[in-house]
Amino acid sequence: MKLSAEQVVEVLRAAGESTRLRLLALLAAEELSVLELCRILDQSQPRVSRHLKLLAEAGLVERFPDGAWVFYRLAGKSSGRHLIGHALDLIDDADPAVRADADKLSQVRAERSTGAQAYFARNAARWNEIRSLYVDEAEVEAAILRAAGEGPFDEHVDLGAGAGRMLTLLGQRAGSALGLDLSQQMLNIARDEVAKAGLARCELRHGDIFATGLPGGCADLVTVHQVLHYLGDPAAAVAEAARLVAQDGLLLIADFAPHDHEFLREAHQHRRLGFEDAEIIPWLEAAGLRLENNIALPPSSDEGLTVKIWTARRPAAASIERSAA
């Protein structure tokens, strides 16, 4: 997209300050909360918020509240996005400030991952019980079966497989299946559940949802069930999941609609308190998928949460990125 001379000046003016340029570099890596940005930059919240406000007013970043937290990400459709991208590409990776920011971002990610993995390890044995605390699991599973369709599917890949429930739920509709998870404790339980279900052609593997190592277009059904709200970069996870979807294949995502159960961050390591359609659908479209179903399952009690199910299909004639992430 071409910009007017005045638009270029506005973009450069907004980005043309060292802290704001560092903020853009960090947000180019992933969405981050204001508190995380303050910690990485070692600056006060009022100061960081002021810089973020200027970047948002220039259309370079997007602000989105999530419960009591506020997150920022690079604006997806900003007219100045390409210009900023070129500016960031010019920065030397060895620049002391940028390198220090990258190191601190790595620390934040590591601590986030350690906390989540410790939580999963502690709770693996009672995972199905925990998963059912705020939703009617039977209703959700029935809706997932309807949304997935009868199949049969040649290959089902479940990302963030947890205790293996999606594998056993959909097991009779898939010729073969693969579940990936970072938690060995979860994988051990999933193996037991898969064995009990008699699913001989179902493999459990230690793997990262952001970099699965699987070839593009390898599955005609990919599921991501109650995983995104734990992740620091859900958009990247959706992109990787979509990359695995074969032509005419289906991606099924189940997660919470936005809610205000703030205690879930500490009690259950939720990073995000649900997702708007306005987030998920553009991520699917950007990955080359077409939305097929958008289902909301309201809670049966005041304490419950609304569950959303999004399904999207890759058009039969679409090209697929084959290389593994």
Task: Show where each model-derived region lies.
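Amphipathic alpha-helical dimerization/coiled-coil segments
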Residues: K2, S79-N128
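N-terminal helix-turn-helix DNA-binding core of bacterial DNA-binding proteins
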Residues: E6-P46, W69-S78, A143-L145
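Conserved alpha-helix/loop element of class I SAM-dependent methyltransferases that forms part
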Residues: V135-D154
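Class I SAM-dependent methyltransferase SAM/SAH-binding core
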Residues: E155-V157, G162-A211
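A short acidic, Gly/Pro-enriched loop at the edge of an enzyme's catalytic core
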Residues: F210-V222
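A short glycine-rich, Lys/Arg-flanked "PGG" loop and its adjoining helix->strand segment in the class I
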Residues: A235-L250
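C-terminal alpha-helical "lid/dimerization" subdomain adjacent to the S-adenosyl-L-methionine
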Residues: L250-T306
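Core SAM-dependent methyltransferase catalytic element
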Residues: A296-A325
